[in-house]
C-alpha cells in the first residue's frame, strides 16, 4: 500500500512489530463487566448495603437482612419466570393479576377440601394454564405479547374478584404452610431456600440443556433458530408456560407469608417489579440475553430499596419513582452494552 492511499492513522510496519500496550486496569474491568454484568450487579448491591448500613438505622441487623431476603424470595421466582419470556423477546404483563388469582384459588381450594397438596397443585395448574394461553395466543394467533398479556391481566383480575367476591380469604390453619413462612434451615428462611432451589433448576435448564440453548437462539433471531432446527413455536409456548408456573409458585410463597388469599395481591405494581427485577438484573428487553444470578440480584436490589424507604419513613410514592428510574437506567445501560459488544466483535 502506498503512502497516498494508506488510511489515516494506520500504524507503520515498525510500529506493527511493537508489542501491544496492555489495557489499563479500569478498561479491563469495564470490559469484564460488559461481558459479565452479574459482577457489576454484585458490586452495586454490596455498595448499596454498605451505604444503607451507614445511613439507614436498623438496616444492618441480622433480622432485617433476613427479612429483605425473605421479601425478595417470591419476587425472585416470579422474575425468573419473566426472564424466560424476555429471553425469547416477549413480555408478560399478566403476572400481577395471576398472582392474585392463584392466591385466591389456593385458599378457596384449601377451604373446600382441606388438602394442602391439592390446593397447591390447583394453584400451580392455574398459573400454568394462563401461561399456555398467553403463549398460544402469541404464537398461533399472532397477537403481540404486550396486548395478549395485558388482556389476560384483566381476565385474571376479574376471575379473582368473582371467586373471592372481592374479599380477602383467610387461609385455614395448616402447620406445613405456616412453617413455610416461619421455619428456617440453618438460619436461612425456608422461603429463601425454596427460591434458591428454583433458581438452581432454572440456571441448569438455561445453561446446561438443549432447551436452554434454544431459548437463547429464539431470542436472538427466530428465523435463524428455525432454520437451525429449533422448534420455535414449542419454545415460545413453553417459555410462557414456565413464566405462568413461576408466577404461581411465587404467589403460593407470598400467600404463605400473609396467610391470606387476596384478589388484589399483585396488581400492576407486582408486574412492574417483576419486569424491573429482570431488566435491572441484566436481562435485555430485546431478547437473547439474561441470567438467573442477575435476576436474583435485581430482586434483592429492589427489595433493599423498598426496605430502606420504609425504615426511613419516606413516602411510598418515592419507591415507584425509583423503580421507574431504575428501569430507564437499566435500558440505557443495556443499549450501551449492546453497542459496546457490537463494536468489540
What are these model-predicted stretches?
Residues 247, 258, 262-323:
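Transmembrane alpha-helical segments in multi-pass inner-membrane proteins
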Residues 55-67, 160-165, 181-184, 205-212, ...:
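Inter-helical junctions in multi-pass inner-membrane proteins, predominant
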Residues 41-53, 82, 153, 157, ...:
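Hydrophobic core segments of alpha-helical transmembrane domains in multi-pass membrane transport
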Residues 46-112, 136-142, 275-293, 325, ...:
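Single transmembrane alpha-helix segments in multi-pass membrane proteins
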Residues 27-34, 86-91, 111, 128-170, ...:
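Short loop segments and helix-boundary regions at transmembrane helix junctions
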Residues 1-48, 220, 227-234, 305-345:
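Cytosolic-side transmembrane-helix boundaries in multi-pass membrane proteins
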Residues 145-208, 235-238, 257-267, 342-345:
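Transmembrane helix-bundle core of multi-pass membrane transporters
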Residues 115, 119-123, 129-134, 138, ...:
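Helix-loop-helix "hairpin" substructures at the membrane interface of multi-pass membrane proteins
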Amino acid at each position: 500500500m502506498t503512502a497516498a492511499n494508506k488510511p489515516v492513522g494506520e500504524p507503520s510496519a515498525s510500529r506493527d512489530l511493537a508489542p501491544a500496550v496492555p489495557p489499563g486496569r479500569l478498561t479491563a474491568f469495564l470490559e469484564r463487566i460488559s461481558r459479565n454484568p452479574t459482577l457489576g450487579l454484585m458490586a452495586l448491591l454490596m455498595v448499596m448495603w454498605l451505604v444503607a448500613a451507614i445511613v439507614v438505622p436498623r438496616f444492618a441487623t441480622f433480622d432485617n437482612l433476613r427479612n429483605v431476603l425473605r421479601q425478595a424470595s417470591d419476587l425472585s421466582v416470579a422474575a425468573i419466570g419473566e426472564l424466560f419470556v424476555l429471553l425469547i423477546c416477549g413480555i408478560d404483563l399478566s403476572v400481577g393479576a395471576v398472582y392474585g388469582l392463584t392466591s385466591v384459588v389456593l385458599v378457596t381450594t384449601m377451604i373446600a377440601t382441606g388438602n394442602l397438596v391439592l390446593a397447591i397443585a390447583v394453584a400451580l395448574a392455574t398459573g400454568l394454564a394462563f401461561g399456555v394461553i398467553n403463549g398460544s395466543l402469541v404464537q398461533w394467533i399472532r397477537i403481540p405479547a404486550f396486548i395478549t398479556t395485558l388482556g389476560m391481566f384483566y381476565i385474571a383480575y376479574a376471575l379473582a374478584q368473582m371467586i373471592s367476591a372481592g374479599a380477602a380469604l383467610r387461609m385455614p390453619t395448616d402447620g406445613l404452610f405456616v412453617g413455610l413462612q416461619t421455619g428456617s434451615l440453618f438460619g436461612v428462611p425456608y422461603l429463601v431456600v425454596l427460591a434458591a432451589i428454583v433458581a438452581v433448576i432454572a440456571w441448569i435448564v438455561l445453561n446446561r440443556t438443549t432447551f436452554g440453548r434454544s431459548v437463547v437462539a429464539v431470542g436472538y433471531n427466530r428465523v435463524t433458530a428455525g432454520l437451525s432446527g429449533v422448534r420455535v413455536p414449542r419454545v415460545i409456548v413453553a417459555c410462557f408456560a414456565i413464566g405462568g408456573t413461576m408466577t404461581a409458585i411465587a404467589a403460593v410463597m407470598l400467600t404463605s407469608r400473609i396467610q391470606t388469599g387476596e384478589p388484589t395481591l399483585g396488581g400492576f405494581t407486582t408486574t412492574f417489579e417483576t419486569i424491573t427485577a429482570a431488566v435491572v438484573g441484566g436481562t435485555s428487553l430485546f431478547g437473547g440475553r439474561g441470567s438467573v444470578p442477575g435476576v436474583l440480584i435485581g430482586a434483592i436490589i429492589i427489595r433493599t430499596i423498598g426496605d430502606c424507604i420504609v425504615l426511613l419513613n419516606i413516602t411510598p410514592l418515592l419507591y415507584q419513582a425509583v423503580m421507574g428510574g431504575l428501569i430507564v437506567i437499566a435500558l440505557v445501560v443495556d443499549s450501551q452494552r449492546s453497542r459496546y459488544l457490537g463494536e468489540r466483535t
